Amino acid sequence: MENLGRKDGFYMITRQGMRTLMLLLSVIILSAPGCGLIHRERTPEEVFSMALSGIAGKEKLDFVGEAGLRRESSGLFENQFKFEGKLENHDQLTLQTRLPGAVTAAGSSKVNGMDAASANLTTQPSGFSASFQRKKGQWEALTAEQEPLRGSLSRYNPIAQLENIDRMNKTIKSEYGSGRRTRILRIELAPEDAKAWATTQLNDEMNAIKAEYMHRASNIKGKNKAKLEKELSQVWQQGEASMEQMMKQAKVQTVYHLTVDRKTSLPLRLSSESQVTYQDASNKSNKEALVMDVNFKTYD
């Protein structure tokens, strides 16, 4: 009986010791840096969602960017320009364009392979600005009636870009090259959604240009005013019909690269390339790419 009691006591001590050991091991595992139980790597979809939520909660932010059109036939950038933007009061955004060749942070007129010398905007004396207000999730241009063309700058609003990406079908993958401080996501829109969005943006810009020219025609005095307005309407109808026909047969591929800060989950950079392959009036195949690169500077 005495030996049995000792065995029972030894068994109880051993069991108690095992519980203590398991508890200590659990504490060590849970507190170990880099442990998968606590620091699970977020999926690309989760990283994008957190980045979108992070930027949506900011009252103020600043960004700078550059955009240009590249044609496959020449490989050069055309219609290149730089821009900068400022968000205030959460829903008020101002975009300001700048001429190619403006001094950059590095003091160079060439950024990300885009050579300012290839741009054709040098005839303009300066850039211009446009203001936007976010209402019910949509960005509306706050431009004067005599300056409708400024509203076409909405294409270069990176916040609206991220919001629209969220609504569309897409594939998100982690890109090689992500470091300890950042995650790089490759986001490719579904072809149907990419084409529909490109068509919508082209229509918006066509309407803005039409409104600009019709306004100028309305300021003309004399008997030729009505004739000019009629001719302009006919030209735009033909242009819209041609664009509609072109986009019906076109193929669009849009890919974004989003760099996200691992610590804050805020976007640091958003670059994109939207390639459009289409046939012109002579049935010749053409390929153009709209390239955009935005760097987010400060958040508040």
State what each model feature region is.
Residues E84-Y156:
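An acidic-aromatic
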Residues I13-R19, V27-E84:
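N-terminal leader/targeting segments and the immediate start of mature chains
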Residues N79-F81, K230-D300:
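Acidic, serine/threonine-rich low-complexity disordered tracts
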Residues G179-Q253:
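Short helix-loop boundary/capping segments
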Residues I55-G57, I172-R183, T259-L268, T298-D300:
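A short, structured loop/turn motif at beta-sheet edges
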Residues M1-Q16:
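N-terminal secretory signal peptides that target proteins for export/translocation
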Residues W139-R186, P191-A194:
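Extracytoplasmic beta-rich ectodomain segments of secreted or membrane-anchored proteins
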Residues V64-R70, L99-A102, R186-W197, L232-Q238, ...:
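Generic short beta-strand segments
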